[in-house]
Amino acid sequence: MEKQGEVRQVPVPQAEPRPEDVSTIEGILKASYETISGGVGVPRQWGRDRTLFAPSVRYISILKDKTGGIVKARTYDYQEYLNESDDFLVRQGFTEVELGRKIERFGNVATVLSSYEGKVQSTGKVVTRGVNIFSLYFDGKRWWIQTMLWDEETQQNPIPAELLPKK
């Protein structure tokens, strides 16, 4: 039983990487959205998800105070991110979809700007939109996500048109 204030350790099952998930940039991005998405009460695919990220991955969330003025970066390692997000994702039936992307690649490294929309099945409402920035590297055999940085859309900070679906 967890004590008051303790964070639950989310278990991560061992899994082998799927070739279709890690052989291309497009594949790894598709998989990253699939693994965190699911219905209310449906466990997330954390074993599969873990195979996408480098052992030393960092997640960085950009946070604004209630007035929208002060901006801070919150950094998580892999387990911290799961521990903080799993309950919400499962309880609310969170689903995140990619809206558009821009890939910049040089040799074995790539940066991807990927716009997203997050919806909760419990209410059917869109609860977040923004841009994920993925830093990836290719080790000669497969792609790895090294960092994932994101910022949410606001009225003052809309998603750029080039990262939205064409009308």
Can you annotate each of these PLM segments?
Residues 1-8, 111, 129-158:
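Short beta-strand edge/turn micro-motifs at domain boundaries
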Residues 1-51, 164-167:
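Short, low-complexity N-terminal intrinsically disordered segments enriched in polar/charged residues
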Residues 17, 37, 57-73:
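A short gly/proline-enriched turn/hairpin at secondary-structure junctions
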Residues 32, 49, 57, 112, ...:
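Hydrophobic pocket/interface hotspot
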Residues 42-66:
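Short, well-ordered alpha-helical segments enriched in acidic and aromatic residues
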Residues 67-122:
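Surface-exposed, charged secondary-structure patches
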Residues 70-73, 122-126, 154-162:
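A short, polar/proline- and glycine-enriched secondary-structure boundary/capping micro-motif
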